[in-house]
Amino acid sequence: MDKYEFNIKVEQIKKLVGKSDYETAMKIADTIDWRRVRNTNLLSMVAMVYEKNEDYEEAREILLLAFERAPIGKRLLYKLAELALKEGNIDEAEAYYREFSDLAGDDPRQQLLRYLILKAKGAPAQQLIHSLESYTSQEIDEKWLYELAELYSIAGMADRCVETC
């Protein structure tokens, strides 16, 4: 495939992603050899296309390509950990979490990722509450506040549940 044809396909993918037509975007993405692409933003977008189509293995492979080209990308490590969890690979997710934590310093997403891993392991509500409280104390996110309120309810902490709501 020459550069002109590649650029046309990439533009088509971008337009389809803009329209949330991930299925068609994936069909076009399947025709491209992503190992030759150096642009990490483009690789990340294509990985998202595969993820939206629940092809987590291909999404992970493409994110690994992006990570090889930008190994200091904590955003990529976070996404790789999320994909590993979606694939049910907790050990791999924990490895990415450790790398992410080493790079991230005090990024609040560390706590969120820790929560997601603990949840995947089936940890008790009290343990999940601690991680989610740490995250929501730094980041106001309605989705996670709601989930925290649900955990309070499960743990029998009705007063904290109402307070969070």
Predicted features and spans:
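Residue-level detector of the short coil/turn that links helix A to helix B
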Residues: 20, 54, 88, 122-123, ...
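Residue at a conserved register position within TPR or TPR-like alpha-solenoid repeats
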Residues: 16, 50, 84, 118-119, ...
